[in-house]
Regions:
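TOPRIM metal-binding catalytic domain and adjacent DNA-binding surface shared by DnaG-type primases
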Residues: 1-53, 99-101, 214-251
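Charged, low-complexity surface patches
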Residues: 2, 108, 159
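Short linear sequence motifs
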Residues: 10, 22, 70, 80, ...
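Short, exposed beta-strand "edge-strand" segments with a Pro/Gly-rich flavor and a Y/T-containing core
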Residues: 14-15, 85-97, 186-196
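Low-complexity, polar-biased intrinsically disordered regions enriched in Pro/Ser/Thr/Gly
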Residues: 34, 63-68, 185-192
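Phosphate-handling DNA/RNA-contact segment within nucleic-acid enzymes
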Residues: 36, 42-147
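TOPRIM fold recognition
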Residues: 104-105, 116-251
Length: 251
């Protein structure tokens, strides 16, 4: 779980969150780097008991965080590359190992591993895990780790009805479930065409740190100045009763 500087997904996260937060997210979710494709990302599936089940390898565009799908879809599995004799695939949620660290926090489920990382930073009140696809990890043996938990489903656009159909099974298993369908009800045609998910919507709402990282990318010397002077990004109301924010730095 190193060589992050060569990792294309890490490079994208760096542009959004800065180095400290990007490193925290990669280590928290045990994300690695592969040389199958230069700078590709390894998403290890580690279960609630800390056992590695398998891992998915994908290649991302560092400029926009999208998966590389041309001239072919850059996605594969570690178990398919090593050809281990007698191996039986038994997947689990990406990020499932985090369930053992906090038994009280509400759990949010998304499709994409990348989206789990991004949403975890912006909405830390949830414990974010990923199913790995529209139909991934919804068998009862996968869902059993969520028994007794409060769960919110965040389907990609176009998958809301499919995920809504899973709710009755989950409730029968003792899982308290809510469906976040705001995106499905309010998305634009362009967003639907691009298959937006919660992380895509989150990234459209630029927070101060993201804006700062964009400034640093254009002028790297700004980062040196910030570190040299010990500047800290602030965001505070201009007036106690105003919702307008003033952004800047403090020493």
């Amino acid at each position: 779980m190193s060589h992050y500087k060569e990792n294309k997904l890490f490079q994208f996260l760096l542009s959004q969150f800065g180095e400290d937060e990007s490193l925290r997210l990669m280590k928290l979710y045990r994300v690695g780097t592969a040389n199958h494709w230069q700078g590709s990302t390894v998403f290890w599936q580690t279960d609630i008991q800390g056992k590695v089940r398998t891992s998915k390898i994908m290649l991302y565009n560092p400029a926009n965080g999208r998966r590389i799908k041309e001239p072919h879809n850059h996605i594969t599995w570690v178990h398919s590359l090593i050809h281990k004799d007698g191996f039986t695939l038994k997947q689990c949620f990406f990020g499932e190992h985090l369930l053992a660290k906090d038994s009280t926090k509400s759990v949010a489920i998304v499709e994409s591993e990348k989206s789990a990382l991004i949403a975890s930073s912006y909405l830390p009140q949830y414990l974010w895990i990923a199913s790995g696809g529209k139909n991934g990890c919804f068998r009862e043996e996968n869902l059993s780790v969520l028994k007794g938990r409060n769960v919110v489903l965040f389907p990609d656009l176009g998958a809301t009805d499919d995920w809504a159909a899973r709710i009755s099974t989950m409730q029968r298993m003792g899982i308290t479930v809510k469906l976040f369908d705001y995106l499905e009800k309010n998305a634009t045609p362009e967003q639907r065409k691009n298959g937006f998910d919660i992380a895509d919507f989150i990234l459209e709402v630029k927070r101060p740190q993201t804006i700062l990282q964009g400034m640093i990318a254009k002028n790297p010397s700004l980062n040196l100045l910030i570190k040299e002077l010990g500047l800290v990004l602030i965001e505070e109301p201009v007036h106690p009763v105003s919702t307008v924010k003033r952004r800047g730095f403090k020493l």
